Amino acid sequence: MYILVWKEGQQIRTFQDLEECGQFQTASNITDGQIFSINVTPTMSKGGETGETQLRRLMYLSASTEPEKCNAEYLADMAHVATLRNKQIGVSGFLLYSSPFFFQVIEGTDEDLDFLFAKISADPRHERCIVLANGPCTGRMYGEWHMKDSHIDNITKHPAIKTILFQIARSFSSMWSYLPKNAANMLLLGKNPNKQAPEPMSVVVTFIYLVEFSSILAHPGLTEQCADILAAFVDACVRNVEGTGGQVAKFITGICMAYWPINRAEDALVGLQQLSEDLAELRSQQPPGSALSLIYSRCGVHYGRALLCNAGFRKADFTLLGDCINTASRITSLSVKLKVPLLLSFEVRCLLGDEMREELESSGLHKVKGRDKPVQVYQFNAPELDSAMVRAKIEQFNPGRYRALCPVKPYESLHPAQRPPIFDDTPRENQPKLSQVQRRDSLVDRLSLIAKLAFPSSMMAGGEGQLITLTYISQAAHPMSRLDLASIQRIAFARNESSNITGSLLYVSGLFVQTLEGPKGAVVSLYLKIRQDKRHKDVVAVFMAPIDERVYGSPLDMTSATEEMLATFPPLQDVLSQLAKSFISLETYVPSTVVRYLTAGNNPRNLQPVSVEVVMLATDICSFTPLSEKCSLTEVWTICNTFIDACTSAICNEGGEVIKLIGDCVTAYFPPTGADNAVHACQEIVSFCAQLRDAFHDVLDCRSVVACGVGLDFGQVIMAQCGSLGMTEFVVAGEVSARVMEVEALTREAGRAIVITEPVADRLSPKLRDTGIVPCQEGVDGVPCYGILGPEWELDVATIKKNIYGFHDARALAAMKKVDDGTNAPGRGAPAGGIPSSPKVRPPGRTNSVSSYTPDPNEALDPRMAESVFLDMCHQRGDTANNSIAVKLRQAANDDRLDLGRMLQGPHELMPVMQAIKHLTNLRMLNMSDNFVDDNNVGELVESCIPMRSLQVLDLSNNPGLTKVIALKRLIKHNTQVREILLNGTRIAPTEQRKLQSSMNVNRLCASTDLKGSHKYEH
């Protein structure tokens, strides 16, 4: 275990490995931290001294399919059979049943556990096995039990333990289908998604649009059927994406984001084509009046490097980040203009086989938003998909008497007890504002001010004297001694007695479980105080509901689970602790509305779809594409994490609800009466970015150029859950959802960091409306817009872009200076002519030419080193080496040919490959076709080819990023043996190709008079 200590010991965090610790320190820009390594020796029960190695412990939760049969005899029979089987394979563990859930822990070797858990998962006596913990252990904790069984009633009659086991397990099981697939897979492996380090990976990414969904939402006759449309769209996407080996990353208001591994590119396109066919079949089967006849999809596909990571803390999203995600979104938007159902980039085309390539048609080069260079796109020969046609069909649609399967009802028309808890009505006390220094110093600690519980609106309907029960869990900030617990009991007993509150407090190895009963006002007030108590952390409510009579008669029934209960069944402590930790982890990924509905004792599958008016918020980072293009994936993660934390903090503190985290974009909504709160949240977000820039002003940190725009709009949305049990989404969709993104984009043109529409302005308080807003010259969809007045709320996009490019240039110069300082150390010669010593780092504005490259006479080039150079560079960059390329390089060391055509997985592999092939001085033929070579990197490739004095053929076919021949001319000048450079499928003009060939012909004619030493590498 490793401990990171910073701020002179004021902040401490523990990590399981040194790499994770280092990544956190770098991402958090901690310069004064110290890392300590400590060894922890666990306490083990009998069986831990056997000297066994490579053991693993797995804990899971499942629901019984026949709970009525699960009595003590039933469990005893089950455990007897398991004991005989486990004894043979050397597995130990225990089984606990608390109706209707099973909790089981098994210990053994990897092979034994994999075999046993596969059989357990297929057992029909239970369902939905969810792994709570799965990891290596140094010894057996339950070595004396091959399978110990127990019914909860045989352990204790304590109601608090029964409550916590049932409520957490029920909530855990219900929330599972709402999790992002990546987070769910992490939990199945026994890993905490919140603790996982970012993982770079090569992916094929797509955005699937529900065509003209905003027009469907705007049609008054289709409001009732919107939930049906979304449900059908979600199911179709999940079925075709997961059926072809992909994963759905998220759903965003009629948009599905999904991805596939690099080796499933063809499967991805097949799945997307099948999705279009499935929706066509669905449309053809609909009766008159069904809105499902209006479902069309269009997709854009791109390939690149992305970062699979956990974004956010308070409200988290396990998702993909990276420039390729933005490009995939732009390509999908381009498909609207080109009227095609499926559009893919050149990078995706490079991954396809010859047979599928022949089916593609080039759609040309197109400029897309956020990118300086045009994008080459391709399409299949498919019928045209015109959005105007779909829009006209929607406008002419008449539902008639058709009734929706899941009708949407107006929120205000429902009885208060039936309304879903879509708004955060948590009573808020006056909370201290953080100073600028505090905010700058700690971006994580300030999240403690976020309300972690919002009470259901049905609970708020009753008076202050309504009798309620509330159960919460929390973790102790520090270990509790018997004296500490006695003090808590003494003080709490007197306080609860004066407030007419009864309940129980259970302490289990650092975990508090408390149930409070009493008048609603007193219980809520006490809970708010507990939430601020510094002795607690991670306070989460798991159950709250009205009651008719009390269960507890004492103001405080204090129980420590280290006495008779653990003497009867010691593993109970592990079950409670691990279950609570897993629940806390899940709660950050699940929509707050679902969590509130669960804590009120309801099944979230019964949430009523409603239509309601809200104030919608959207914000993202200005000029994020040019900022992220030259930043590492880890830096992109740092930027997004910092920004998301600030947004969720500001939104939740003002009573808003975070809807989605979409890369650098955050969307949220506020109640219709919360316009002022929404503006205050916007001001807090913009102020945070300004203070962040000031904090990193004097250092070369990517966060020193972060700025944002925020838009607010008002309108009606539909809130509904859709999807099957495999994946469920709580969707907030409406015409305002799309329009607010345009309002946010208007901040750049208006020069105001915060822009609101006229409906929002009408709902502001008189003081803010009359003195705090100024009209914008332009509106959105005919709706007038206003900017928040004040010099601190101005937004200068030109200055922001200038600062971003200046930051990149300054960092490049700093890197070059660092390299040159090492090169020009005493005893080494300085570079001549002011030329940078290292070709790896170029000053800004330098052209891609080999004219300024000077060979290093001391550089040792050995063909046998090519493979090791490639592997070393991949390791230094943190990438997984491509084994196929490594094998090719090894073979080329004893050959004169190297065929790497279409072998690179992405542009990130070009630099390691080019540094490796530089050592292959024996090559006569080099094939680099279909390998992401463009004008930016062809100079580096030519530099690598210059040492190949016998090179005759260079194949650069199907690299459309090539438009210039200047670097290739330099190659021909220095390597006169070159006979052919293949440029089919590039964008180099035919006239330039002919000139290049003429130069090679001249070299061939002059070959007989070639002078000794004419090659620059001959000495």
Curated annotation (Swiss-Prot):
Domain BLUF: 55-148, 467-559
Region (Disordered): 822-861
GO MF, one example: ATP binding
Keyword Membrane: no
Localization of this protein: Cell projection, Cilium, Flagellum
Reactions catalysed: ATP = 3',5'-cyclic AMP + diphosphate
Top-level taxon in the UniProt lineage: Eukaryota
Any Pfam family matching the protein: Guanylate_cyc
Any one of the GO BP annotations: cAMP biosynthetic process
Biased composition regions of type Low complexity, renumbered to the chain: 825-839
Protein name listed in UniProt: Photoactivated adenylate cyclase subunit alpha
Organism: Euglena gracilis
